[in-house]
Amino acid sequence: MSRRHRAVKREILPDPKFGDVVITRFMNALMYDGKKSTAEGIVYGALEVLRRRGGASADPVVMFHSALDNVKPAVEVRSRRVGGATYQVPVEVRTERRQALAIRWLIDASRKRGENTMQERLSNELLDAVNNRGSAVKKREDTHRMAEANKAFSHYRW
């Protein structure tokens, strides 16, 4: 165990347009080389596309949170060595990590898509996630499937 103090969690300010902390986290994860304004443009553009595609009653922030909830994993597997053998042990995912994984998976899935601009890719991936399809949702399902397959080793939890 480390002898140092645990790092204090930094407070993240809500984004200027919607006043949502999760959207700021998403922007920070999307950002390359400290280019926050570029990341902001991409996220706000994608949310604008969601608003246009969703119809008059569609709130892009609600759709964004819905997409995120559909990608959040409940369980994951972690490697555990027991007597020379390595087991994939299913463990429940903490709330913060759930959110972090969902954000990371959405961004990775968006970057791998074939559309021309990142704005299009992100908006399409978010729409797919809202409708429970797409690469990010598939990643969550694969993670759950892996945990289900290794349920027998759940007594090795720590």
From Swiss-Prot:
One of its GO terms (cellular component) is small ribosomal subunit. CDD domains: uS7_Bacteria (cd14869). Keywords: Ribonucleoprotein, Ribosomal protein, RNA-binding, rRNA-binding, tRNA-binding. One of its GO terms (biological process) is translation. InterPro entries: Ribosomal_uS7, Ribosomal_uS7_bac/org-type, Ribosomal_uS7_CS, Ribosomal_uS7_dom, Ribosomal_uS7_dom_sf. The keyword Cytoplasm does not apply. SUPFAM superfamilies: Ribosomal protein S7. The keyword Transmembrane helix does not apply. GO terms for molecular function: rRNA binding; structural constituent of ribosome; tRNA binding. One of the primary rRNA binding proteins, it binds directly to 16S rRNA where it nucleates assembly of the head domain of the 30S subunit. Is located at the subunit interface close to the decoding center, probably blocks exit of the E-site tRNA. Belongs to the universal ribosomal protein uS7 family. Part of the 30S ribosomal subunit. Contacts proteins S9 and S11. This is Small ribosomal subunit protein uS7. It comes from Gluconacetobacter diazotrophicus (strain ATCC 49037 / DSM 5601 / CCUG 37298 / CIP 103539 / LMG 7603 / PAl5). The lineage of its organism: Bacteria, Pseudomonadati, Pseudomonadota, Alphaproteobacteria, Acetobacterales.
